[in-house]
Curated annotation (Swiss-Prot):
This is Fe(2+) transport protein 2. It is found in: Cell membrane. InterPro entries: ZIP (IPR003689), Zn/Fe_permease_fun/pln (IPR004698). One of its GO terms (biological process) is zinc ion transmembrane transport. The chain crosses the membrane at residues 56-76, 86-106, 131-151, 216-236, 248-268, 279-299, 310-330, 350-370. Residues 77-85, 152-215, 269-278, 331-349 are cytoplasmic. Keywords: Cell membrane, Ion transport, Iron, Iron transport, Membrane, Signal, Transmembrane, Transmembrane helix, Transport. The lineage of its organism: Eukaryota, Viridiplantae, Streptophyta, Embryophyta, Tracheophyta. GO terms for cellular component: plasma membrane.
Amino acid sequence: MMMSSSQTPVRIAFVFLVILAATDAHSDHRTPPPACGGAAVGGECHSVARALRLKLIAIPAILAASVAGVCLPLFARSVPALRPDGGLFAVVKAFASGVILGTGYMHVLPDSFNDLTSPCLPRKPWSEFPFAAFVAMLAAVFTLMVDSLMLTFHTRGSKGRASSAVAHHGDHGHCHAHALGQADVAALSTTEAADQGSGDVEAGNTTKAQLLRNRVIVQVLEMGIVVHSVVIGLGMGASQNVCTIRPLVAALCFHQMFEGMGLGGCILQAGYGGRTRSALVFFFSTTTPFGIALGLALTRVYSDSSPTALVVVGLLNAASAGLLHYMALVELLAADFMGPKLQGNVRLQLAASLAILLGAGGMSVMAKWA
């Protein structure tokens, strides 16, 4: 009897623990799952208000950089320091390319990996395949394919000697260096030499064949810009990560300015009228801001704290990283490093290489706290 009474407290304690465990299990079952995306993933970098402020600043900043880049060739003749064939221009351009590379690899791509490998997403398929790297690779290859196909279609559609000039002397036109890559690059100062070497095409930009060739180049460059600028702007507009948006604004301003210089030189050489020039400048300058505005509208479609936000922003960031990689290496750097200006000047080539490292290194250091 005494043994039974001594076991009573033990039994009461056991029953109490069972009830407590059942209560905890029941409360855990009714507690909603933690939010995915938003501050749960971005931490201190996630801020809808600050991100919106940066986007609203980015739209006019990128617009101004685009307009300045396109219009700069108009004044380059009177200001020697601003001429695209100068050594200082090549070094500054290399530094800007390093900034673009660093932004893509050190800021945008890591955020894409974080979003697409978040534990908030289903393990299948997001944790079993590197979607971020895959989409970045596809974006770069797709941009190359679009540029190449557009050049092919425009070349076949052009008749007479101008099409032959594009096919055989494309490597002597600086104005399309940003769009067509290594096989189509060189300095503006070598254009006349290429025309003299062609035999049947008169020297100068006033001939009919040369004008048609330059107009084909402008159309190819313009369409390529529209494709990738909208995608990158869309990725920035959809992101709520301040640490991603801040360096991306600087990188896009650099890119739009230098690519605008290339397009502006093309437009001048193509001999377009004032109305056509204005239309080309307008479309170039507004594509990236339009993409940002479109991304802002996209954020209204889904909840910022949902798995959908992680997938959408992660995929767009991955595509943006691939495009930044392509733009920096193919459109900006290959044109100069494989051209005669840097190939014939080792000191200038080393200075440009150092500028790339400084630009990319600066963005890498920023990734430590931004």
